[in-house]
A protein has these predicted regions:
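Positively charged n-region of N-terminal signal peptides that target proteins for export
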Residues: 1-6
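Short glycine-rich loop/turn motifs that provide flexible caps or phosphate-binding loops at active sites
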Residues: 7, 32, 97
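Bacterial N-terminal signal peptides
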Residues: 7-17
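Extended hydrophobic/Leu-rich segments
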Residues: 9-11, 34, 88
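Boundary at the C-terminal end of the N-terminal hydrophobic targeting segment
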Residues: 20-22
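Conserved beta-strand hairpin/beta-sheet module of binuclear metal-dependent hydrolase folds
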Residues: 26-74
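Active-site HxH/HxHxD metal-binding segment of metal-dependent hydrolases
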Residues: 73-134
């Protein structure tokens, strides 16, 4: 039951973060230890992170590795605790292309259909985009 409370708080953070066009993400604390990054380079996805006593949970890893690194930097400005989980809400690139930056994360969590999509035709298209990242 306690876990559901945190899921609700994370979803609230996602609600308050929007899709926007800007240069640098802005970190906003929307609740105690719950942060959202608004704005970013190019098409921006919602990115939220929660700092618990054990570590950090990140929701959606951004549209590029460069943007994902900005998320990591924002986390490190708040805490040095380990990043335990990265959650992908769905398979679109603006929510998953930053996964590679979080490869040292304990676990990347997503619905099984996200994995199926990334392993199927959508994943082949994603792989071509991944190859273009430096």
């Amino acid at each position: 039951m306690r876990g559901l409370k945190w899921v609700g708080i994370i979803l609230a953070g996602l609600f308050f973060s929007g899709v926007a066009w800007a240069d640098e993400p802005k970190t906003v604390e929307v609740w105690k230890n719950l942060f959202t990054l608004t704005h970013g380079e190019g098409i921006d996805s919602n990115t939220t992170f929660l700092i618990s006593k054990e570590g950090v949970i990140v929701v959606d890893t951004r549209v590029t590795p460069a943007e994902a690194k900005k998320v990591k930097d924002a986390i490190r400005k708040q805490t040095q605790l380990p990043i335990l989980y990265a959650i992908n809400t769905h398979y679109h690139g603006d929510h998953t292309f930053g996964n590679q930056v979080f490869k040292d994360t304990h676990t990347i969590i997503a619905h099984e259909n996200v994995r199926k999509a990334l392993e199927g035709e959508s994943g082949k298209a994603h792989l071509e985009v991944f190859k273009s990242f430096k």
